[in-house]
Amino acid sequence: MTPTDQEFNDPVGYLSSDKVSKLGATYGLVKIVPPPNWKPSFHINPDFKFHVRKQVLSDLGITTRSRDFFRENINRFLKMRRKRQLKLYFNVQGTRVYYYDLYREVENLGEPMDKEKWEKLGARFGVKASALEREYDSTIKYYATYLHTNCTYDFPESDSEDEYDSCLVCGQHDHPLETLLCDNCDNPYHMKCLNPPLELVPATSWYCDKCLIGTGEYGFDEDVDVKYTIPEFYKMCQDFDAKFIRDYNQNNPLSVDDIERKFWSFVDAEKSDLEVKYGADIHNLRPGEVSGFPMADTPSLDTTDPAIQYYINHPWNLNKLPFSNGSLLNFINTSISGMTIPWIYIGSLLSTFCWHVEDHYTLSANYCHFGATKKWYGIPSLFADKFEKLMRDSAPDLFKRQPDLLHQLVTLMSPLKLVEHGIPCVYADQNSNEFVITYPRVYHAGFNCGFNFNEAVNFAIDEWLEFGEKSVNDYRPIKKENVFNHYELLENILSRFNAKHDVSLDLVKRSLWSFERYVSRLEELLAQLKDKSTVEYKPSVDNNDEDDLCDSCKTHIGFQYFVLEPENSKQLLTPDASPQEIETKPNKNEEAKKVANSQASHDLASLNERKAMVDEFNSLIEKAKKDVDNDESTKVRRSKRIHSLKEKEVPQRPTKRAKKNIIKKKAAQSKLCSECVCPMEGKLIHGKLVLRKQLSTLKELIEETKMNLV
């Protein structure tokens, strides 16, 4: 889009106009080319330095990572059993079959497998069914059984603040000679605390359940000790570009289309050593380092110059856009780094930003100050659900372990594959002095064609309102943190309207409808909770502290929440168990009863139909764990395992239980939103219900708004 000078002076009004907003809804991405005379000067502190992320492109494809994830975990399992290590795939009659794909297909069909099912798989892979069955039984079968018996396993969490290496199961730091260190993660476990317990140090490699099952965690490496200036990073980019052109393009110049083809070939490669660097999410706070746009506090800037003042105050200056006229972020009472305060992105050839949506499904504005093209891909919001389903279906095991995977910005899938599955994908080539706008709940991704300098912020238009509420509901089950209180934003819209401020009537009506439903729900929850606990009125205080989030679901605690008070000991909180877990010295008889009556015990009982397979599995894995050689190499391995713990031997400390589903809290109190407390019906609740605002006050606001709308 090429807005006129007049249109360009009102960004939210322009982007909300029927013509442009319909394009945003249809395509998801809109590129804005400013009027020819709009050219803000670039201002950044000469001392500006930044960290970079190291990105291995072949690690980012969702299919490749799923296969790698499975191979790593099953190979640990096989190593404990002294079995051969697997590659990613095996060949049958010249056809490549991936082990993970075979595992998933068997899981989808469900065990027990019969001849008909194997024939169906053979037809699907285009190979003999007998070859698939033989390979599955010899390599995957027992690992699949292990995963089934541990499908509800909750990983014990290590406390990074612990001074010593304590057993992750019981929390004690004692018996170092009877403590194993996992050969992958180095976490310590008492042999007696394992299930089943071990009597001898294993002769082979030993891995904890967490490393056998896998967490699905992935993140970019970052060298925290290395920072680049812009000239240093530019020189590094030039050197990398020259080498890349020589190695991968026969010294011929690269077009954007060439780079695009090569980018996706690296992403889809099974393994590539190509590593690129990206200065992403840079949020320095010193004056002159927050943004490339001129700001009132930019050092050495002549703020009396009318031309400078023009750009400092222009609504397309990304420091101004989030709170420009018409942006709904004016109704939140705080600044948010990366959302209302710009973050800087300094790209290099092939550096990438993976598929994601913006926080709270807001709109984003990205501006390129200078440099090479940034290639964008976008998925219209109408297809967001279909996209999410495709990603989950492509990597069910990763999503099971990382429910918020799509919010981690570490996963890619080729646009061509999306189109194959009926998901439209659009693109934009962003160049210097151009903006790219992403509309609400538009998944987007892309890569850089070379060195460039961009920055981005978020804002919200009236059409965003329902998307914002949906984001809160979508975040709860995956425990993604809220960035601001959506319902406080609605409250502020109604309050400003009642105070005779100029607020769109349509926006007020939609806000009122949503807010009234929310208050009605709070009233229902309050009725359930007030008889179970004491009620305290505690007026809310404006802050943007993490303390405003529910300790369970990470949703904003809102206008009422539940405080779990300490009672004789620290209380530990979980949405899946009683809201109060008291730390006491365990009684062995009581512990035995708990185990006997636990969900795990019932789950085990349900596996009786497959008892023969499980028994065989247990026998084999126990043999691998307990088989101790008497030769010198075994003594060396045993010494290696316990050496670090022997050096750290300290006086015994009080017991600290690390129970399943328990969230560790430094503070004595824990906060739960009322939505998380109410499902605990019938369970003992020790604590108090805190009202930040009386429901009567919220109802009065609703009634006043209705009267003013008449």
Model-identified regions with their sequence ranges:
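Surface-exposed polar/charged interaction patches
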Residues: M80, L109, Y146, K623, ...
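Conserved N-terminal structural segment that caps and organizes enzyme catalytic cores in eukaryotes
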Residues: M1-K54, Y153-G171, L177, M191-P197, ...
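Structural motif
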Residues: E434, Y439-V442
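Short polybasic/polar patches that bind polyanions
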Residues: K79, A123, V419
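Extended, structured, electrostatic nucleic-acid-contact surfaces
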Residues: T179-D183
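Acidic, Ser/Thr-rich intrinsically disordered and amphipathic helical segments
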Residues: F69, N73-R76, Y98-D101, E116-K120, ...
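Eukaryotic low-complexity, charged/polar intrinsically disordered regions
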Residues: M1-E105, K120, L132, T139-N150, ...
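Chromatin/DNA-recognition segments of nuclear transcriptional regulators
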Residues: L88-L109, M113-S158, D209, A428, ...
